Each structure stands twice: as C-alpha cells, then as structure tokens.
A protein has these predicted regions:
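Long, compositionally biased regulatory regions of eukaryotic proteins
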Residues: 3, 86, 95-97
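Intrinsically disordered, low-complexity segments enriched in polar/charged residues with Gly/Pro
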Residues: 59, 87-91
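Charge-dense, E/K-rich amphipathic alpha-helical interfaces
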Residues: 2-78
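Charged, often glycine-rich, active-site loop that binds/positions anionic groups
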Residues: 76-86
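A hydrophobic membrane-anchoring alpha-helix module
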Residues: 90-121
Length: 121
C-alpha cells in the first residue's frame, strides 16, 4: 500500500502506460545487467581465488561460466585466439584450452569463450 491507500503494483493509466511495478522491474533488470557486466570486468582482472568467488556468486544468480576445453571448435559459439599444432588427428578441431571463459545468463550468451584450437602440424 502506498501513502494514498493504493497498491502501486495495480496502478495503470487509461492509455496503457506502464505501471509503476513495470517501471521498477525494468529498472531492476537494467541494474542487474550493469552489475553482471561490472563483475565480468572485475573477474578478468582478478586473482584465481577472487575469480572463483565471483564465478560462484554469479552462478548463484544464473550467470554461468563457459569453458570449452575438449569441445569441437564452433565459431558460432567460441572465439579463436590462437592455435596449437598437433600430430594427433583425433585432436584436430578441438578446443585445446579456454584462455578467457565466456558467460551465459540463463541461456543467453553474454560473451563467448576465447579459446585456442588444435590444428595440424
């Protein structure tokens, strides 16, 4: 209840303008996106222990790290940063290492992992 006795979540105008609750939700979502981006920025510059803690915290709100080690390289899902030559034909085209983890927010990719890929020597 607000001061004037109305429930702000039920307020709507005759012309279909967003309710106060819709505006607050939009603001909260925008602030969440900004905080997640700030966490990713900090994560890229942090020590291993801090990285683990930030990833744990992000995971608790649905933002998960993407590491592609051992997966088949897919340019639509991975960003190639380099290659690793190999004579092992079974490794060709696989991700050798994730250099920078990617992140996904409840199924929506925020950034692709940056990887190195095995190629023929």
């Amino acid at each position: 209840m607000s001061v004037n006795g109305t429930d702000p979540t039920e307020m709507t105008s005759d012309d279909g303008v967003e309710t106060i609750a819709d505006e607050l939700l939009d603001q909260a979502l925008a602030e969440r996106r900004a905080l997640v981006q700030l966490c990713l920025y900090a994560l890229d510059r942090a020590s291993a222990g801090v990285v683990a803690r930030i990833e744990e915290g992000l995971s608790s709100i649905g933002v998960v790290a993407l590491r592609a080690d051992g997966e088949r390289f897919d340019p639509s899902q991975h960003e190639a940063a380099g290659t690793v030559p190999t004579d092992d034909k079974s490794l060709l085209g696989l991700v050798a290492e994730t250099e920078v983890p990617g992140f996904c927010d409840r199924g929506r990719v925020l950034r692709a992992p940056i990887v190195t890929v095995y190629t023929a020597r």
